[in-house]
C-alpha cells in the first residue's frame, strides 16, 4: 500500500519544523514536499500533526526467550510500535543468552517471525553473561549482533573488559555497559540517600556507578574502542563522561526518561513500581543529567523498557525485581515534562530519540529522507490523556507514572511503509 500524508509538519535537515506532505511508495519515502499529488496512494490528512522519523531505542528488554511470562517479542514490539518506536535494540539477558551461533540464530528466527518493528539484538560479551569466558564476537557479528554487552550486570573483571574492547574495536563494533561495581552494591534496592535512610533500606551509592564508568573509560582509551554507557544516573558519572569526551576518548552515553523526570524526592512510598536499576537518585543528580543532555555529554535517550509481572512487583521493594516498562509512556512523558516546561525544545527531543541514537551506532534510520525505508511516527502534540497501564500492549504494567496526565501521543506508526499500529479514530 502507498500512502500520501497531507498537511503535516516535520523536522527538516536544518533542524526546523516546517509544513509538508510526505509520500510513501513501495515501503520507502518517495517524496517530502508541499502540495504533493499522487495516483494509487491512500490519502491521509494528518491535519497539522507531526510526521516524525520512527523513534529509535537502543536499550530494551524483550524477555524472550525464557521470560515470556513478562514479555514476548510480539507483545514488546507491539508496545514499541504504540510508543512510536520503529527500531529497538534488544538486550541479551534472556535465557538462553545470545552468546553462541545456535542461540543467536534462534533469536533471529524468533525476531523474523514475531517482531512488528525492527529489532536489532545485542550479542553477549561473555558466555551466559557470567563474566568469565568471552563469546565469539566474529560469529555473533556475522549473525547480526548490533553491539556487545552483558547488560543487567557489569563486567567485573577489568582484563576481560579490556580484551572485549580490543576485539570489538577490530570489528568496528561498540561495547555497551551496565556500570556497577559489585563490591559497592551493598544489597541495595534504592539509591543511598534520603529515601533509603528514611525507610531503613539498603542503598546503592552513586559511586557504585561512576567508579565503574571511570574504569571502563580508561580501558576504552587503551583499546581505542567505542564505549557506550547505559542509563547514566549520577552527577559524578556525568562529570567523568564529560571529561573523557574532552580528552577525545570514544565514549557515548544514554539516559532514561524516568531519570530525567523523577528523582528520589518523588518516590511517594515503598512502591516497587519506583524500583529500577540504576535507582532514582538525588535532585542534584537529576539536574546534572539534564545539563549533560543539553551540553552533549549525554548523547541519547533510551527507555530501558523492563517489563515484569504484577506478581513479581508485588513482592515488596526489597524482593521485587528492578525495572519499569517504558515504550508506551516515553514520548508523552518527555514532551510534557521537558518540552512543555521549556527545558529542551521539541526539535531536540526528536533528535535525542531518532537521529542521535542512529548516528551513535551508525544506523541508517532516524531521519526522514527520500529513498529511505518509511519508518515513520505520526505524533499528536495536542492530545492529552492520563497514563493508564491497563491499556498497555506490553505485558508489563509496571510503571510509576500511572495517572499522570501527559500531552503529545503517537497516533500512527509505520515500519517499512506498513502501518503497524494506529490509534482508533486518530486521523478521522
From Swiss-Prot:
Pathway in which the depicted protein is active: Pyrimidine metabolism; UMP biosynthesis via de novo pathway; (S)-dihydroorotate from bicarbonate: step 3/3
Assigned protein family: Belongs to the metallo-dependent hydrolases superfamily. DHOase family. Class I DHOase subfamily.
Enzyme class: hydrolase
Entry protein name: Dihydroorotase
Cofactor: Zn(2+)
Keyword Transport: no
Keywords: Hydrolase, Metal-binding, Pyrimidine biosynthesis, Zinc
Amino acid at each position: 500500500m502507498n500512502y500520501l500524508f497531507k498537511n503535516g509538519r516535520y523536522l527538516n535537515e536544518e533542524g526546523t519544523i516546517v509544513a509538508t506532505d510526505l509520500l510513501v511508495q513501495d515501503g520507502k519515502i518517495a517524496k517530502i514536499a508541499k502540495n504533493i499529488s499522487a495516483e494509487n496512494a491512500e490519502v491521509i490528512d494528518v491535519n497539522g500533526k507531526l510526521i516524525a522519523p520512527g523513534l529509535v531505542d537502543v536499550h530494551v528488554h524483550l524477555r524472550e526467550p525464557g521470560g515470556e511470562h513478562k514479555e514476548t517479542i510480539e507483545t514488546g514490539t507491539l508496545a514499541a510500535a504504540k510508543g512510536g518506536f520503529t527500531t529497538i535494540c534488544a538486550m541479551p539477558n534472556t535465557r538462553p543468552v545470545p552468546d553462541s551461533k545456535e542461540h543467536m540464530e534462534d533469536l533471529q528466527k524468533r525476531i523474523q517471525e514475531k517482531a512488528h518493528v525492527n529489532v536489532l539484538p545485542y550479542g553477549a560479551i561473555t558466555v551466559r553473561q557470567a563474566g568469565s569466558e568471552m563469546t565469539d564476537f566474529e560469529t555473533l557479528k556475522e549473525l547480526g549482533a548490533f553491539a556487545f554487552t552483558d547488560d543487567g550486570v557489569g563486567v567485573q573483571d577489568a582484563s576481560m573488559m579490556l580484551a572485549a574492547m580490543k576485539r570489538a574495536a577490530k570489528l568496528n563494533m561498540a561495547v555497551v555497559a551496565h556500570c556497577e561495581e559489585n563490591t559497592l552494591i551493598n544489597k541495595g534496592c534504592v539509591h543511598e540517600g534520603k529515601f533509603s535512610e528514611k525507610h531503613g533500606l539498603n542503598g546503592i551509592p552513586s559511586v557504585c556507578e561512576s567508579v565503574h564508568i571511570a574504569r571502563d573509560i580508561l580501558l576504552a582509551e587503551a583499546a581505542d574502542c567505542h564505549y557506550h554507557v547505559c542509563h547514566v544516573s549520577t552527577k559524578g558519572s556525568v562529570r567523568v563522561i564529560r571529561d573523557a569526551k574532552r580528552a577525545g576518548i570514544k565514549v557515548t552515553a544514554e539516559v532514561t526518561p524516568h531519570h530525567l523526570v523523577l528523582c528520589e524526592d518523588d518516590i511517594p512510598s515503598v512502591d516497587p513500581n519506583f524500583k529500577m536499576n540504576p535507582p532514582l537518585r538525588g535532585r542534584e543528580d537529576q539536574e546534572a543529567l539534564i545539563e549533560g543532555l543539553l551540553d552533549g555529554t549525554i548523547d541519547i535517550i533510551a527507555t530501558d523498557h523492563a517489563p515484569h509481572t504484577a506478581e513479581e512487583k508485588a513482592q515488596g521493594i526489597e524482593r521485587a525485581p528492578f525495572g519499569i516498562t517504558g515504550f508506551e509512556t516515553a514520548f508523552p512523558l518527555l514532551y510534557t515534562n521537558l518540552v512543555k516546561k521549556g527545558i529542551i525544545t521539541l526539535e531536540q527531543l526528536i533528535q535525542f530519540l531518532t537521529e542521535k541514537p542512529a548516528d551513535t551506532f551508525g544506523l541508517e534510520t532516524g531521519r526522514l529522507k527520500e529513498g529511505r525505508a518509511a519508518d515513520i511516527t505520526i505524533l499528536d502534540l495536542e492530545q492529552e490523556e492520563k497514563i493508564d497501564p491497563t491499556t498497555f500492549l506490553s505485558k508489563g504494567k509496571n510503571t510509576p507514572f500511572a495517572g499522570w496526565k501527559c500531552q503529545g501521543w503517537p497516533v500512527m506508526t509505520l515500519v517499512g511503509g506498513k502501518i503497524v499500529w494506529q490509534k482508533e479514530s486518530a486521523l478521522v
